[in-house]
Amino acid sequence: EDNIENCLLSIENCVDEIIVVDSYSTDRTKEICQQHKNVRFLEHTFLNYSEQKQFATDQASNEWILSIDADERLTPSLEDEIKSLELNDENISAYYINRKTAYLGKVLKHGGIATEKILRLFNKKRGHFADVKVHEYVETNGKSKNLKGYIVHDPYKNLSHHLGKIDKYTTLWAADRYERGEHCS
C-alpha cells in the first residue's frame, strides 16, 4: 500500500496493460490500483516470488513484459526509453535495466547494491521466471541489450522493516536450498 501509487504512476504511460498480483492483502492496495487506468488487479495465493511473477506473466495479453515490484519506480528517462523501443526485433529477447537502490529515501552511491543491472523487460515467448523462492530472476533464450535509464528501488521504510526483510528472505533462501538438497552442518 505504501509504495504502489508511485510505482503505478511511473509505468502507466509506457505500458498498455498493468497486471498487479496481490496475495489477498487487507490494506488499501486493491482500492489504489483500481483508481489507475489499464490495471488488472488479480488475487493469487502466494507460494513464492518466482511463482507469483510467472503467474502475472502468464496473464499478460502482450508478448513483452516489464516486471517491476511495488517498491520500485521508473525514472522519466527510462519511461521515455521504453516507449521508444522497437520491440519487433526477433533477435532480442530481453533488456537489462539499471537499478539504483535507495535506503530510507536516499539513493545510494556506493556499495554492492547501489547500482546493479537486472533483466526486467523480456519477451514472454522467449523467457520465464526461474523456479526459485526468493531473489527471482528471468531466464531467456536469445540476445539481450542494456537500457540506459534506471529503476529506483526503495525497499525499506525504517530499520525495523529492513531487519524484518532480512529475516524473511534468509528463511526463504534457506528453505529453497534445503529443498534442492543443499544442507548445512
Q: Which residues make up each language-model segment?
A:
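Aromatic-flanked redox-active Cys/Sec active sites in thiol-based oxidoreductases
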Residues: 1, 15, 23
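Acidic helix N-cap motif at the loop->helix transition within catalytic regions
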Residues: 2-6, 27-35, 77-78
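Short, acidic, metal-binding catalytic loop of nucleotide-sugar glycosyltransferases
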Residues: 9-18
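A conserved acidic beta->alpha catalytic loop
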Residues: 10, 22-31, 46, 69
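Glycine-centered tight turns that cap/initiate beta-strands
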Residues: 14, 38-41, 64, 91
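Conserved donor nucleotide-binding strand/loop of the catalytic core
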Residues: 16, 30-59
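Catalytic-site signature of metal-activated, phosphate-bearing donor transferases
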Residues: 50-57, 63-68, 75-185
